[in-house]
Amino acid sequence: MEHTGDFGHIKGSLHLMRDIEYVDQNPISRSSRSNPVTYLKAYDEIRRLYAEQALSKQLDFSPAYFSFNTPGGRCETCQGEGTITIEMQFMADLVIECEQCHGKRFKQDILDVHYRGKSIYDVLCMTVNQAVEFFSEDETCAKIVKRLKPLQDVGLGYIQLGQSSSTLSGGESQRVKLASFLAQEENRPTIFVFDEPTTGLHQRDIEVLLKALNRLISNGHTVIIIEHNPSVIMAADHVIDLGPEGGTEGGYIVCTGTPEEVARHQESYTGKYLAQIIDSNHAK
């Protein structure tokens, strides 16, 4: 092609694909009440569990009472936020703990409902890893564990269940979205497009991410990744190297092929790095 961005045609088994998903690093929701477990629908199962407890049945608490998004069981002073925001005209807004619920987001009678000694607030304070261990001890909570496991699979076992989505980094938000796709029971063949998913990740986290991406592929999906990380490029089935330089001096296809084929291309900067990795692996 004469100009960057031009193309002649697209070919492949596109008729087999049913959807295309661009998985970006934007927040999973604009709502401050949104969190990873509401996004993956795990909280629906947790609310049902608490509504089934003896005290809930005695007081006629439905699952809706354990939601901080609707009136009923939530603290109405902070509307389930756990905090109060004071607007400051010439400074950053001041966020303070709600004096009514002391940051626990719910009314006291809701907090009095316990499952194995834990209130709904206690569960929201658990990390994903802690929650999976906690609920795995009860076979009746299999649905909850099934919903939470994908967060572990993408390396997010350290985040809290009730952690606001606004506190997640771009990379964490992207992995929450990836976890939601892994959790889907219906596997419509989909093309997933990721833009620099390894940004800010340690090498161990990258290895976890690659396992999750390979699960998508095993489920019949196609994954397209825009990436500079050599570990990810080496794991690819097919590489398209754009260049030769960056910015306006790039955008042209330098070479394509397997990582090994790209490594043998003399004009590819990417190939030089891949060749070093391949040589290092052979030396071991």
Task: Give the label of every model feature segment.
Residues 1-284:
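Conserved phosphate-binding elements of NTP-dependent enzyme cores
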